[in-house]
Amino acid sequence: MDRGIDLQGTFIQSLESLGLSPGLSKVLWMPLPMLLMIIAATVGVLVTVWLERKISAAVQQRIGPEYAGPLGVLQSAADGLKLILKEDIIPAKADAFLFTIGPALVVIPVFLSYLIVPFGQELIITNVGAGVFLWIALSSIQPIGLLMSGYASNNKYSLLGGLRAAAQSISYEIPLALAVLAVVMMSNSLSTIDIVDQQSGYGILGWNIWRQPVGFIIFWIAALAECERLPFDLPEAEEELVAGYQTEYAGMKFALFYVGSYVNLILSALLVSILYLGGWEFPIPLDRVADWIGVDPANPILQITTAALGITMTVLKAYLLVFTAILLRWTVPRVRIDQLLDLGWKFLLPISLVNLLVTAALKLTFPVAFGG
């Protein structure tokens, strides 16, 4: 299989050809993908916020943002600049250290999770063998920051919001992990690159959504609950808790919570596209299209085109899921806290366990179709 364009290897070899040592070349390479990751995720947040406002306005037969740039595309940037310039206030009776570190613990693990998200064969920051496990481990840190923020605010609404966030995250983390384990079992690997490779070769018919329809639904529901999207936004329910754990926050700290929420939503959509929708793979395999038109797979122009189309396909699949999440906000009413916990513990958890056992049985019975 063509491994695509190795950006890291090409960059390091170029620096070595200029006379730099291999160690120094790697040191110069390391900050570049991380900086690109932060910039791309931030731009993705601005685009998602603008899309949510426009789609929400269309659902309600409104216009939405209109004056800040063409079609209001700069409204999100203007709001972000406003929050950056606002005064940073710490309540007099709050724990200043925990109050400050809480938003950082919410945002940093989400950004670090992008390390294992591939956009192509070699278009990944770090292809660790246990990439999926790393993401699950990082996602378990976020509830600590939410609970810490609610506790440190010394406010009853903030504390209740933090407790709700922790309970919600713990309830849905287990079904989420079990749904991922079923995919890992079929691909025989925890690497996100290997999971996409396992879905290649047969086009849309090889995607995991056909072999794991139940796991796909469980993962997406649990991911929306982890992102605290409606109908699962109980930790910040305005009618009940003012703004939940965000009540006492202002300025940049307040913005970090929203950035973390939207970055997490985009991350969840990207992971769904990688785990269940073939990642960068097209519905019709591009290598077969190249054979039909008689193009050499080693052609550099074809490799560049394939890499660009792979990135586009991954992002399009992710934003299709983001679109469904935005529509759900205006379609499904908010659930009660008891309904939320019942859905996680009494419904999704048993179904995810049964799905894992059925996947194991199918893997033994039909090893060719289920990755035996």
From Swiss-Prot:
This is NAD(P)H-quinone oxidoreductase subunit 1. It is an enzyme of class 7 (translocase). Its EC number is 7.1.1.-. GO terms for molecular function: NADH dehydrogenase activity; oxidoreductase activity, acting on NAD(P)H, quinone or similar compound as acceptor; quinone binding. It catalyses: a plastoquinone + NADH + (n+1) H(+)(in) = a plastoquinol + NAD(+) + n H(+)(out); a plastoquinone + NADPH + (n+1) H(+)(in) = a plastoquinol + NADP(+) + n H(+)(out). Keywords: Membrane, NAD, NADP, Plastoquinone, Quinone, Thylakoid, Translocase, Transmembrane, Transmembrane helix. It is a multi-pass membrane protein. Its main location: membrane. The chain crosses the membrane at residues 27-47, 97-117, 128-148, 176-196, 204-224, 254-274, 308-328, 347-367. It comes from the Bacteria. PANTHER family: NADH DEHYDROGENASE SUBUNIT 1, NADH-UBIQUINONE OXIDOREDUCTASE CHAIN 1. The keyword Repeat does not apply. GO terms for biological process: aerobic respiration; photosynthesis, light reaction. Pfam families: NADHdh (PF00146). It comes from Synechococcus elongatus (strain ATCC 33912 / PCC 7942 / FACHB-805). GO terms for cellular component: plasma membrane-derived thylakoid membrane.
